[in-house]
């Protein structure tokens, strides 16, 4: 994000072309997000109800682990796409941009939370659909603002808006970590025996050991997503005064990578590595929360002194 803070896009033609292609990508993402949402959840109350509770002829409630998995993927990709797009507004004095970014994040977060409201109450299906539509409207509005700013506005770094972005990312980090915790709990478990059985199998539970292909299918996509997420979180720590900042930034990269790769060690080098998996998982949660709260605290403190 260095060029979004102190750089000049319009005076740097290669950078201008890159940002233009980025905006094109964001437009394509927004367009295909309609199809993605319809394919996964459904763009009608009937399809949404079927996603949660099965077809009328064969009603079957979706498993909470499957719901958590779909929701955490949707939350991650939509937040990052919207966050990168919103970051471009940092250089342009567009009116109401703070309100727009907060509204977009709020609608996305409420859409995610509505899944669990539907799951446990079997109501509010229309609310989920409305929140997604509102998020898409705000996403497109942000895209229009970014294009307008790139064409017509003079570039000027907006540090107050940057603080807003950082606080929003920190809040997202907390919410996303909660989602990951419950997904981990439902799919793997929180105790030694749960993790051991998940990777090594258990004949009494008719659970087979994980294959290399199964492990790599989980590890490979998580490698890039975890790197992107924790690199961004560590990167934002550069903007706050912190004594042991470098150590925390290194831990934010090493611990999540250890947690992600620990499954291979359990499967091929012995079940004693279950302790490594559990330790790295709980440490990952702790340092994520710690980093996020430090960013929020600093953002609030600077606004009070402004």
Curated annotation (Swiss-Prot):
Keyword Zinc-finger: no
This protein's record includes keyword Cell membrane: yes
Topology class, membrane: Multi-pass membrane protein
Taxonomic superkingdom: Bacteria
GO cellular component: plasma membrane
Compartments, as annotated in UniProt: Cell membrane
Keyword annotations from UniProtKB, A to Z: Cell membrane, Membrane, Transmembrane, Transmembrane helix
Protein name: Uncharacterized protein aq_1264
Organism from which the protein derives: Aquifex aeolicus (strain VF5)
């Amino acid at each position: 994000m260095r060029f979004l803070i102190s750089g000049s896009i319009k005076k740097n033609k290669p950078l201008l072309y890159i940002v233009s292609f980025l905006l094109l990508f964001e437009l394509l993402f927004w367009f295909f997000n309609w199809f993605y949402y319809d394919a996964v959840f459904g763009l009608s109350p009937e399809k949404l109800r079927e996603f949660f509770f099965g077809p009328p002829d064969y009603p079957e409630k979706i498993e909470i682990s499957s719901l958590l998995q779909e929701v955490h993927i949707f939350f991650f990709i939509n937040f990052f796409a919207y966050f990168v797009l919103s970051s471009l507004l940092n250089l342009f004095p567009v009116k109401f941009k703070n309100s727009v970014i907060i509204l977009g994040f709020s609608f996305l977060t409420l859409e995610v939370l509505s899944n669990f409201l539907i799951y446990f109450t079997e109501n509010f299906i229309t609310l989920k659909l409305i929140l997604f539509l509102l998020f898409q409207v705000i996403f497109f509005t942000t895209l229009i603002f970014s294009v307008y700013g790139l064409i017509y506005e003079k570039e000027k770094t907006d540090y107050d808006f940057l603080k807003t972005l950082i606080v929003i990312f920190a809040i997202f980090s907390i919410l996303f970590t909660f989602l990951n915790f419950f997904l981990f709990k439902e799919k793997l478990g929180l105790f030694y025996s749960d993790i051991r059985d998940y990777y090594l199998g258990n004949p009494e539970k008719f659970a087979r050991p994980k294959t290399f292909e199964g492990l790599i299918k989980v590890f490979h996509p998580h490698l890039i997503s975890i790197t992107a997420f924790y690199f961004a979180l560590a990167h934002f720590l550069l903007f706050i005064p912190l004594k042991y900042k470098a150590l925390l930034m290194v831990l934010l990269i090493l611990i999540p990578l250890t947690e992600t790769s620990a499954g291979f060690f359990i499967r091929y080098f012995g079940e004693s590595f279950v302790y490594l998996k559990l330790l790295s998982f709980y440490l990952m949660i702790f340092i994520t929360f710690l980093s996020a709260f430090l960013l929020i605290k600093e953002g609030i403190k600077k606004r009070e002194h402004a």
